[in-house]
């Protein structure tokens, strides 16, 4: 069947080659790799000593590392990694030059797997729609890093949570959605979330910042409890959501030529 739009990858005489960005434990990279260990890939990282890099080396995969803290401090005299601008783009250009040298060409797909740097506009434009990321929530509704989308879903009264694999563009996790995980019911945490939900209802809380503010005013430590519970739920979501859909998106959908885009519309 011929897809509408432009295919992300067209299988021909070779398999998909991908680059995987890691900054921490590399568990998403593990799942992508384990789903098809034979595919050619390269790992890049801004944190040279992270577990994800060590795992890649144990697998004899080529690795590119460029410490972001040292780079920006030495090259630009900047203590904090910038989100935009020439300085930010220069880092991405340096990393991707090394990645392309290692692969002897451009990657067919770039998988951000716990890569803790926002992608700059140069990289987003150059490789769109060949960059994937996974968001720990429904990216159409709840933004933020880590546990925050889960906390926002709880405050909004959602009955379940899900994770999202999406194409990275210049927005903050607002790129076109490729696939979402099954819904993970929050009912299994009803008892642990009881006090939090009652507080939300009593104080008519609508946002995460409002929850934090009112919890501190009341001195009830529920802001700490909400964060801890959201992290616990996120861990389950990672196992039952991220680890299921990310490898599937890479190997079963894109690598087999089953995905195309027409603008922001995914086919």
What are these regions (language model features)?
Residues 1-267:
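One-carbon transfer enzymes
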């Amino acid at each position: 069947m011929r897809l509408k739009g432009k295919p992300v990858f067209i299988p021909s005489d070779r398999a998909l080659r991908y680059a995987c960005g890691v900054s921490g434990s590399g568990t998403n990279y593990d799942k992508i790799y384990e789903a098809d260990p034979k595919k050619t890939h390269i790992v890049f990282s801004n944190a040279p000593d992270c577990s994800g890099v060590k795992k890649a080396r144990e697998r004899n995969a080529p690795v590119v590392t460029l410490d972001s803290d040292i780079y920006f401090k030495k090259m630009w005299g900047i203590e904090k990694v910038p989100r935009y601008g020439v300085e930010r783009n220069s880092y991405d250009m340096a990393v991707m030059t090394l990645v392309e040298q290692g692969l002897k060409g451009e990657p067919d797909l770039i998988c951000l797997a716990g890569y803790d740097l926002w992608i700059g506009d140069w990289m987003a434009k150059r490789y769109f729609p060949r960059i994937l990321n996974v968001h720990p929530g429904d990216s159409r509704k709840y933004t933020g890093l880590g546990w925050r989308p889960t906390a926002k879903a709880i405050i909004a009264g959602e009955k379940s949570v899900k994770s999202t694999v999406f194409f990275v563009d210049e927005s903050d996790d607002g790129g076109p959605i490729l696939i979402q995980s099954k819904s993970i019911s929050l009912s299994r945490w009803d008892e642990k979330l009881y006090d939090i939900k009652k507080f939300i209802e009593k104080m008519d809380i609508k946002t995460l910042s409002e929850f934090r503010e009112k919890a501190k005013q009341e001195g009830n430590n529920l802001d700490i409890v909400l964060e801890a519970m959201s992290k616990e739920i996120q861990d389950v979501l990672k196992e039952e959501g991220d680890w299921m859909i990310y490898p599937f998106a890479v190997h079963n959908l894109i690598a087999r030529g089953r995905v195309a885009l027409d603008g922001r519309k995914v086919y």
